[in-house]
C-alpha cells in the first residue's frame, strides 16, 4: 500500500465508505449480509449476529473494522462473571471476550453487555482472512451465548 504524501489531505469519510464497500463486496461472495440502521454491516448466525463497524485513524490514514457479536445483554456484574471474563477473555485464536457495563445513571446499572470481538485493518484485508475472522467471531458467540446466559444471566441477542 502506498501512503499519500503528508501534504495531501486524507478524507476520513471517503476512506470509511471505501472500506465498507470493500468489505461488503468480499462478504457477499460468502454469505448474505445486512445493513442496520446505524450503517453497520451484519451477518446472522444461529442465535446471534456479527456487526461490522468502520472507524478512521486519521493520523495513520487507515480504517479499522471491528467485528462484534453479542453474547449477553443485561448480565449482572458479579465476581463470578468478572473472574470468568478475566480467565477466558483470550482463549481463542481469533477474537476475545469483552464487556461494556451500562452507565451508572441508567436503569441497567450493575449490568453489562458481554460480547465477542475482533479488529482488522481495512486496507490490508484479504478475502480469506475476512471470511475466517468474521465467522470465527459470530460462530464463537453463537456457541457461547446460551451456556453463558444460563450460567451468568442476561439475555441472548436472539431473545432481546
Please report, for each region that a protein language model flagged, where it lies by residue.
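Ordered, soluble secondary-structure elements with a strong preference for glycine-centered loop motifs
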Residues: 13, 17, 76, 124-131
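Short, charged/polar surface micro-motifs in flexible loops or helix N-caps
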Residues: 47-50, 56-61, 71-76, 91
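Short amphipathic alpha-helical signal-transduction/dimerization elements
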Residues: 138-145, 149
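Short, highly charged C-terminal tails/helix-capping segments
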Residues: 148-160
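Charge-rich, low-complexity N-terminal segments
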Residues: 1-59, 100
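Short histidine-centered catalytic/ligand-binding loop motif
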Residues: 8, 66-74, 126, 130
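A short, solvent-exposed beta-edge/loop patch
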Residues: 104-138
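Short, internal acidic amphipathic alpha-helical interface segments
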Residues: 66-113, 117
